[in-house]
């Protein structure tokens, strides 16, 4: 596998560990991935959930935790690889999270769950902090590249193209996710590889394309590399590692899951998502969960209307209440059978 070049950086292992929140990919996991020569990604979604005072002031705790986890991940990495963050566009404090991450020294900022149309405006030093949108179609890629070109006279440092087999929030309709054979993801990747060429030529840069969603093993990696992409983003497989920041019970839920345990859900974020069908999912499919408190996490969320509080559901899960929490997962979770380490997993993937 060739190294991944992003701006001035050369990343020895062309693997990005996908951001997973709440609290699944923090400094322990991201730092370990970077130490192996890849790109470790911290999710900023309610990142401060374990900080003292979180129940009273989520915003302040999240900003403090962003700084803390980036510093700790870089310390673990020991100068290897890159440390980045994933910031969801849907977050109420999106701008503050991006600025805090850049100021704390995040090497890359990856942004999805909506189009990050204003992301370039939030980066003071584009030579220091590299940015990438997450897109799921050539149409979305063309739109964001055109917007950044027109409004900010710059382009993306790389593109993360997420297919329909990914976990968490997905840029596809529920109907598409229930009829996967009708989605030509390879075709979308090929179109994106063509559409980025105009902006590469205009700005005299290379825009690497990273394939994400359902990448499980070296066979999957070879398939997308043969299409012409520059690297892959993998998330679910990193959950069943010793270094993952989730509770042991959360990791065991992944290991014990079968393909038939997967559900397509509607998230309060306003997007469909892929998650484990546990007692929590079965309950909220039938009746609205009582919401006792709003954690002010999303720009567009009406507690009176949404079926459950996504912050509470995700925090319950990461802390180990795997029956009553929300467990996002990729489509290949049923193939995960045992715990491993980040070192061994990456050696397997690149071997």
PLM regions with names:
Residues 1-202:
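Active-site entrance/lid segments in N-terminal catalytic domains of soluble metabolic enzymes
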Residues 16, 166-210, 216-351:
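Conserved active-site-proximal phosphate/metal-binding subdomains
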């Amino acid at each position: 596998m060739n190294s991944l070049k992003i701006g001035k950086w050369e990343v020895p292992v062309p693997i990005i560990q996908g951001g997973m929140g709440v609290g699944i990919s923090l400094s322990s996991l991201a730092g370990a991935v970077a130490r192996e020569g890849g790109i470790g990604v911290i999710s900023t979604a309610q990142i401060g959930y374990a900080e003292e005072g979180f129940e009273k002031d989520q915003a302040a705790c999240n900003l403090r935790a962003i700084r803390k986890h980036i510093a700790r991940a870089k310390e673990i990495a020991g100068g290897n690889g890159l440390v980045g963050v994933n910031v969801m566009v849907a977050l109420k404090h999106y701008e503050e999270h991006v600025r805090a991450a850049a100021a704390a020294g995040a090497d890359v900022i990856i942004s999805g769950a909506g189009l990050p149309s204003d992301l370039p405006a939030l980066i003071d030093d584009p030579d220091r902090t590299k940015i990438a949108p997450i897109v799921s179609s050539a149409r979305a890629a063309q739109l964001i590249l055109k917007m950044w070109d027109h409004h900010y006279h710059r382009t993306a440092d790389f593109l993360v193209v997420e297919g329909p087999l990914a976990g968490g929030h997905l840029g596809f309709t529920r109907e598409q996710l229930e009829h996967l054979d009708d989605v030509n993801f390879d075709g979308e990747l090929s179109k994106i590889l063509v559409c980025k060429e105009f902006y590469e030529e205009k700005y005299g840069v290379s825009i690497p394309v990273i394939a994400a969603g359902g990448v499980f093993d070296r066979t999957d990696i070879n398939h997308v590399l043969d299409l012409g992409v520059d690297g892959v983003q993998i998330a679910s497989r990193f959950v069943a590692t010793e270094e993952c920041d989730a509770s042991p019970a959360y990791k065991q839920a992944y290991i014990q899951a079968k393909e038939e345990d997967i559900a397509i859900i509607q998230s309060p974020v306003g997007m469909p998502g892929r998650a484990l069908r546990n007692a929590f999912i079965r309950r909220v499919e039938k009746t609205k969960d009582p919401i006792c408190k709003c954690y002010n996490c999303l720009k567009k969320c009406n507690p009176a209307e949404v079926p459950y509080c996504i912050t509470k559901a995700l925090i319950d899960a990461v802390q180990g209440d795997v029956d009553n929490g929300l467990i996002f997962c990729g489509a290949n979770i049923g193939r995960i059978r045992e715990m491993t380490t980040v070192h061994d997993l990456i050696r397997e993937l690149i071997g």
